[in-house]
Amino acid sequence: MAVPKEVSFLASLLVLGILLLHVDAKACSQRNAKEPICTNCCAGRKGCNYYSADGTFICEGESDPNNPKPCTLNCDPRIFYSKCPRSEGNAENRICTNCCAGRKGCNYYSADGTFICEGESDPNNPKPCTLNCDPRIFYSKCPRSEASAEQPICTNCCAGLKGCNYYNADGTFICEGESDPNHPKACPKNCDPNIAYSLCLYEK
């Protein structure tokens, strides 16, 4: 029995739609895996909102950095980036770096999410950069793939930047940086072998 043209046409459209959805989902999932931050709602910083790769709101962070909650250190696969509100006139709300001194592989953004630059400094072979704060830079996003024992950053908890959290290669929290770039502490220059990468947030 012959299949009516309308049914054949609708079946073709359905198959095409499924194929396009599969390709789009695959492309999406590949893109999402490139630069997610590694955190979860409990461990996320209070006052910061966390979003998926397509901009869907996931949750507000629950942990006060001055009184952190006992949270697991797993990465919520839904979370891709965060946005933290700025308190006007508060210089502590932003990270202090510049494009030259910024970590290679990390992207730096303004407070409204405008891309400023990619960091230029390889932690294994740092460039001779000034230590001034670029007023345009508010926060950074670094690929999770950098959390690798093959490319650890060279710092320690004392010398680490205040407002940045430091992690080992498997994502375990090590410490929060203690050094204010405007009033740096007298810290040793040794590399803590436990530290592999950092995540810096720009709210207090």
From Swiss-Prot:
Keywords: Disulfide bond, Protease inhibitor, Repeat, Serine protease inhibitor, Signal. GO terms for molecular function: serine-type endopeptidase inhibitor activity. InterPro entries: Prot_inh_I20, Protease_inhibitor_I20. Pfam families: Prot_inhib_II. It comes from the Eukaryota. Residues 1-25 form the signal peptide. Disulfide bonds join 28-100, 38-75, 41-59, 42-71, 48-84, 99-117. Sequence repeats lie at residues 25-67, 68-125, 126-183, 184-204. Belongs to the protease inhibitor I20 (potato type II proteinase inhibitor) family. PANTHER family: PROTEINASE INHIBITOR TYPE-2 P303.51 (PTHR33832:SF23), SERINE-TYPE ENDOPEPTIDASE INHIBITOR (PTHR33832). This is Wound-induced proteinase inhibitor 2. The gene is PIN2.
